[in-house]
Amino acid sequence: MVKACAVRGALCAGLFFLAPAVLRAQDVIGIPVGETPPPVTLENLNGDSVPLSRWIGKKPVIVEFWATWCPICAELLPRMEAAQRKFGDRAEFLVVAVAVNQSKNTVRRHLERHPMPFTFLWDGNGAAVRAFQAPSTSYIAVLDSTGKVVYTGVGEDQNIDAALERAAGTPRAAKNPR
């Protein structure tokens, strides 16, 4: 009995001391903050090759990994549109349509029915997914004007404005910029 209590106590203490490390590990989503993604060439929806370097390294860039079937991506849309109205003159908004359970034609048809004010790019071979280490759709990476990642996040609860303010060099108190 005493031995079992000692083992349980040791396990609880170990878990207590490991918990912060586990939580920090969970904060790393996709490409680490401070890194620069490798060069990537995608396609526009007309099939033309487009290097991301056309935008990256010139001014802040927000990249969202998106799919027509992603409900969280749809929930992020109003925030993305509001951020574009606020930062559109100081940042580029790129949406990378991933080739998971959708085709380029599906994306094109979706955008004809539901126009969005962003630059859409097609990641048919997963090059951008690999470069940004995107774990899922609704993943967002924000890069500053030097091309370094200043924020990554996934899901509907992202503070896009704070991330863009950090990228643009106008930080303010933010709930969850990473």
PLM features per residue range, with description:
Residues 9-20:
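Bacterial N-terminal signal peptides
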Residues 40-60:
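A short beta-strand-turn-helix
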Residues 59-61, 66-69, 136:
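Short pre-active-site segment immediately N-terminal to redox-active cysteine/selenocysteine motifs
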Residues 1-11:
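Bacterial N-terminal signal peptides that target proteins for export
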Residues 74-114, 124-131:
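Structural microenvironment flanking redox-active thiols in thiol-disulfide oxidoreductases
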Residues 170-178:
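Non-globular targeting/processing and membrane-anchoring segments
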Residues 22-39, 57:
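N-proximal helix/coil linker or "cap" segments that precede and/or mark the start of modular domains
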Residues 112-117, 124-166:
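Thiol/disulfide oxidoreductase modules built on the thioredoxin-like
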